Amino acid sequence: MAKGAVTKLKFNSPIISTSDQLISTNELLDRLKALHEELASLDQDNTDLTGLDKYRDALVSRKLLKHKDVGIRAFTACCLSDILRLYAPDAPYTDAQLTDIFKLVLSQFEQLGDQENGYHIQQTYLITKLLEYRSIVLLADLPSSNNLLIELFHIFYDPNKSFPARLFNVIGGILGEVISEFDSVPLEVLRLIFNKFLTYNPNEIPEGLNVTSDCGYEVSLILCDTYSNRMSRHLTKYYSEIIHEATNDDNNSRLLTVVVKLHKLVLRLWETVPELINAVIGFIYHELSSENELFRKEATKLIGQILTSYSDLNFVSTHSDTFKAWISKIADISPDVRVEWTESIPQIIATREDISKELNQALAKTFIDSDPRVRRTSVMIFNKVPVTEIWKNITNKAIYTSLLHLAREKHKEVRELCINTMAKFYSNSLNEIERTYQNKEIWEIIDTIPSTLYNLYYINDLNINEQVDSVIFEYLLPFEPDNDKRVHRLLTVLSHFDKKAFTSFFAFNARQIKISFAISKYIDFSKFLNNQESMSSSQGPIVMNKYNQTLQWLASGLSDSTKAIDALETIKQFNDERIFYLLNACVTNDIPFLTFKNCYNELVSKLQTPGLFKKYNISTGASIMPRDIAKVIQILLFRASPIIYNVSNISVLLNLSNNSDAKQLDLKRRILDDISKVNPTLFKDQIRTLKTIIKDLDDPDAEKNDNLSLEEALKTLYKASKTLKDQVDFDDTFFFTKLYDFAVESKPEITKYATKLIALSPKAEETLKKIKIRILPLDLQKDKYFTSHIIVLMEIFKKFPHVLNDDSTDIISYLIKEVLLSNQVVGDSKKEIDWVEDSLLSDTKYSAIGNKVFTLKLFTNKLRSIAPDVPRDELAESFTEKTMKLFFYLIASGGELISEFNKEFYPTPSNYQTKLRCVAGIQVLKLARISNLNNFIKPSDIIKLINLVEDESLPVRKTFLEQLKDYVANELISIKFLPLVFFTAYEPDVELKTTTKIWINFTFGLKSFKKGTIFERALPRLIHAIAHHPDIVGGLDSEGDAYLNALTTAIDYLLFYFDSIAAQENFSLLYYLSERVKNYQDKLVEDEIDEEEGPQKEEAPKKHRPYGQKMYIIGELSQMILLNLKEKKNWQHSAYPGKLNLPSDLFKPFATVQEAQLSFKTYIPESLTEKIQNNIKAKIGRILHTSQTQRQRLQKRLLAHENNESQKKKKKVHHARSQADDEEGDGDRESDSDDDSYSPSNKNETKKGHENIVMKKLRVRKEVDYKDDEDDDIEMT
């Protein structure tokens, strides 16, 4: 055909039946087919349209459009599509005709869903041409366009129809072209489009299933991707209309449903067509800041999901404002929103690394959130995220630190989760995470997890104790069968312990012996009681009583004691020999670890059997289940079984040859040392090894790091030998000769334990006499082993004092003259350390102070040996009195014994003085354990001991307090020492103050202390001690601010006491004791006055005067504090029903009624009462707001600087008075430093003044002549 030629339609057959000319269906079908084929071939630009007019009109006839034959309608639709194409751009039909045409087209589209219909080709042609020539857009201009559009979309979104995948793009194009012509698309259509993202997700279809693609979903994807600009506008409309409709409804549940669906849509769009999110991100941003909590919570959840979803775009960079708004939700006012934010973190951490910095900063806040649910969710992150991802993405040290702090969380659920989580995290980290330079700082925190766990025992909460027991053996120290690996894990755990954790660890293992013994007795009692003959015997009731006591004791340490008793009682009822055997085997002292593990697993497995009760025909009701019994036994076995201190570990611990790590070597030695103390029988199989080490070490001065040192071997063998005397062969001549040689010529520590071992031998006395002959007489100048020989004598005085009966006087006289009253080292050295540790005393460099310390200990042992003779032996009494004066002189003088006029030996080095006064205090406490010697410690001496509690040296305070607390808690010394503990009120060291406070709370709660009201009955003694504290004495003797400051200082001491002790239950008793003080005179004051007046007292006329006005003032302060506490805490105040006498060593009843009446007046000046009341109220208010320990933290930090500085300074030397001064009077004089009392106003009223506090040293110097009447030297027999 020539170019430009017009083509005319050749087809000329009628297609409409008339009455004159009927056309059969088949004929009509053929004609329409022919017409369609020719129309399809015509070109739009070169066709004579006039030739088409006839068929243009005929094709819209209802006879064709509504024909019953499917084929006729199919070909009619195809012809009409061609007509529209050829007439384009103008449609040759009216709106009504077009409406009918599109209805026909839609009916054909429906048939596309049935690929088996005979006209699928024509229908495919139809949809293709309508898209290709955009004829379909004519639908948008029709009056019924909305209805047609809705119907069109319903066709292709019908889930019951199966459209061929090859047409998805065509269908998407058709729908896209149509809605592009609509300014406003019906909401129903938009629902169809967007709901497909909610109802269909190809990623959720299980792999392997041959599932055809969903047409509606694929079309929605095409629409949103290809027509994103138009769809963005429609999405905005859809989102806003849905939200608007929902918010106008008061039904919150419906609103939540709508918001959840919309957010799911946004998430799916982000995963599939992320560019479309721009249309609604503004809504999300505003939802994050909405006043409606529901919107904020769900928007927060949505962003969290978006951040974890895979997408072609990076949300953080694309929508940075919204991301920042999401980050800010960690500070949302609603805890539910903060919880939602935190819950999204685990998945985010596991899927992306680019926002680690922001997450680290935010998470540091969630761990310290005010709401426990947020804190709990934060902890859960460590459970949900693999440990490797945690280490990779969480790098903020504050997060790990906060995790550890939550182990002491007050909310049980958070605390328990945290304890379990951090133990598990620690274990997983050890197994999977390599230590590198990059993660060094995090490891430093993680390494403290074992310490944190062991320190939880100090809380003394039974629930916490049980959980810590469980996590220790589940995660920290799992039941590893390999001995070497198990010990290595133990050393790793211990390698970063702090002091408190070590104490807790050692206490745990010491307790194991007691609990294992109790369980063994429980088994014995159970077997006895299960035997009817035994029960019928006379021993039956006795054993039953012991059995019940044992059950009570074992159950008392468990959180649910009732359930524990039920569990143990049920096991007894089982009367199963195998269970008894397994239980007994698990607590056997020398059971190998593998045997223990097998027995433990079998026992727990048996007890967890669901049919346990049925097997033994026991009915327990619902009170206890098999799992409860298993849990109780697990906890008891964790505590009673030799798991850590196991006999299988000893050989590994003793083998130091293959370990070059100095820290682990030290830990092994430390563990061995503790085992030798608490369970030396474990060395039974190693005694031969220890003896071999001792015999092979010919050179005691040689340092060998590949094995136990000689000192350690001797020490370990000695402690094992004390329990296993029969296991040590003292008949081994070579070995015994070695011990003799070590005792005579060796280093101090070696000498000490060699002598101790000799003292255990059958030939002890004979050998010690030989040693005595070798080392006496003492000669400081010529004796190379002088220090060692003092130790030998010290041990002989302890074990066989009668061996030295003839030499005692000479020894003591020599040591006083040549050691205590002379100095090998004079004055201070710039490079000298402030504190000499006990471990250094055996060093040659510190032999001078070592000699003095061991001499004091020798004196103590000497006093112990003569203690039984003191009541009836004047010489023993005199020596005891003078030795006690020596100890208290050292304490009062600060450790200086040398006169300032002694140019040769004065002064003693400051660090020597520090050590000596501390050692003297410790010796006093040791002697106080012996009743006959305790009587020599006077009330005025107790006041001097406050020196050590408030000493300028932290090691002195710590060492003395630890010994004091240990003796008091174990009730080894008199109650008169207890008030000393409460003079730590101004303790500047955080750790020491905290541990002391914990100790007070713990000891106060002990059953024996509660029953005996020990702490309550210490109040009069505390009042008396405060009244004699130099700060108080000096202040109360003054006027103005000094007087008021003394009162506020006393208030602080009393408040420190009442903060831990006072409660509703003991209030009446405490108030009664405070009042009772005024019913007595201060005996200490009277005794001092009597000493000063001397013989002239009888000549002077008697005056009615109460002794102890200062004591009455402190008593009044005590009453004021208690009344304020009563008011603040709403306590009831009833008169104490009993009558108690105050301690006779401190308080003396009035001789006359007149004297008693003088004490009834008020001693606190009325002008100061209001100020004092205000001071007390303010401080009590702070106590109620926070614990004493927390309240003191700021003060401690401020004081820490001064404390550190004070240790750098040389200790002041207090000068003794001259002999001439002594002759003028016997009164004591305080040192210069005591005259400058510290200001309580600084301590109590202002925080910035804390740095000016000076720790008081109550060191009053007295001349005590230890060389008087040399001809009358004391002889000890």
UniProtKB/Swiss-Prot annotation:
Keyword Cell cycle: yes
Family according to the record: Belongs to the PDS5 family.
Cross-referenced InterPro entries: ARM-like (IPR011989), ARM-type_fold (IPR016024), Pds5 (IPR039776)
HEAT repeats: 393-429
Protein name: Sister chromatid cohesion protein PDS5
Annotated positions of the Phosphoserine modification: 1231, 1233
Biased composition (Basic residues): 1208-1217
Post-translational modifications reported in the UniProt record: Acetylated by ECO1.
Keywords recorded for this protein, A-Z: Acetylation, Cell cycle, Cell division, Mitosis, Nucleus, Phosphoprotein
One GO BP: meiotic DNA double-strand break formation
Note: Present with 7720 molecules/cell in log phase SD medium.
Principal location class: nucleus
Annotated spans, Disordered: 1201-1277
GO MF annotation: an example: structural molecule activity
Domain of life, source organism: Eukaryota
Function: Essential for the establishment and maintenance of sister chromatid cohesion at centromere proximal and distal regions during S phase. Also required for chromosomal condensation.
One GO cellular component, as annotated: meiotic recombination initiation complex
Gene3D superfamilies listed in its UniProt record: Leucine-rich Repeat Variant
Chain intervals with Acidic residues compositional bias: 1221-1237, 1266-1277
